[in-house]
């Protein structure tokens, strides 16, 4: 199935310039994560972050999230890049931030993590499946438990919640409204209107 990407036409001193909508948003330092997170999506998001850092290392990047989650390794690559680059990454949930999407939402710069009022945020423990010989299954089980412990530790640091509470809350799908996510410490503010930039 092919996806249609809207085009935006702008007038410049050299005439008209057409951009796909994502390139136009990038000019305003906006990255839109609007799908499941896999290696391809992670590489695109990371490349955009690195580009924006090179453009201006002191200006915030705005990461809009509407994602059901996805690959842990791909999501952690985005997470690590968010911590690595110099600009603050402001996160904004529009719609759904679930699983790794919620993790990335919470990983935004403190004071700059937002959700629109009807957003839904969901945290849970990592899921995985494997097959093969018993020893291989044991190796994978140990790995996913280590990943779970690492994700819980990071969420505990981000939210200020005790590790034991994070472990309980992520044991099953834990859905939250935007306001509940704010109380939990995953975001800083529920926003309804974008503030106009100062003139």
UniProtKB/Swiss-Prot annotation:
Localization per record: Cytoplasm
Catalytic activity: Hydrolysis of proteins to small peptides in the presence of ATP and magnesium. alpha-casein is the usual test substrate. In the absence of ATP, only oligopeptides shorter than five residues are hydrolyzed (such as succinyl-Leu-Tyr-|-NHMec, and Leu-Tyr-Leu-|-Tyr-Trp, in which cleavage of the -Tyr-|-Leu- and -Tyr-|-Trp bonds also occurs)
Cellular compartments per GO CC: cytoplasm; endopeptidase Clp complex
Top EC class for this record: hydrolase
PROSITE patterns: CLP_PROTEASE_HIS (PS00382), CLP_PROTEASE_SER (PS00381)
Signal peptide stretch: none
GO biological process annotation, one example: protein quality control for misfolded or incompletely synthesized proteins
Disulphide-bridged cysteine pairs: none
Family (UniProt): Belongs to the peptidase S14 family.
EC assignment: 3.4.21.92
Described function: Cleaves peptides in various proteins in a process that requires ATP hydrolysis. Has a chymotrypsin-like activity. Plays a major role in the degradation of misfolded proteins.
Name of the protein in question: ATP-dependent Clp protease proteolytic subunit
Quaternary context: Fourteen ClpP subunits assemble into 2 heptameric rings which stack back to back to give a disk-like structure with a central cavity, resembling the structure of eukaryotic proteasomes.
Organism: Moorella thermoacetica (strain ATCC 39073 / JCM 9320)
């Amino acid at each position: 199935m092919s996806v249609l990407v809207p085009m935006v036409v702008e007038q410049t001193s050299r005439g008209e310039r057409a951009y796909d909508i994502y390139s136009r948003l990038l000019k305003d330092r906006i990255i839109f994560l609007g799908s499941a997170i896999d290696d391809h999506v992670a590489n695109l998001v990371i490349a955009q972050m690195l580009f924006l850092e090179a453009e201006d290392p002191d200006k915030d990047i705005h990461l809009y999230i509407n994602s059901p989650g996805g690959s842990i390794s791909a999501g952690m690559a985005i997470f690590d890049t968010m911590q690595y680059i110099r600009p603050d990454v402001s996160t904004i949930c529009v719609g759904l931030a679930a699983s790794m999407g919620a993790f990335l939402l919470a990983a935004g710069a403190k004071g700059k993590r937002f959700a629109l009022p009807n957003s839904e945020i969901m945290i849970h423990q990592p899921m995985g499946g494997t097959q093969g010989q018993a020893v291989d299954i044991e190796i994978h089980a140990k790995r996913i438990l280590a990943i779970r412990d690492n994700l819980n530790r990071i969420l505990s640091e981000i939210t200020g919640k005790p590790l034991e509470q994070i472990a309980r809350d992520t044991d099953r799908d834990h859905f939250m409204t935007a306001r509940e996510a704010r109380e939990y410490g995953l975001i800083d503010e529920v926003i309804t209107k974008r503030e106009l930039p100062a003139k």
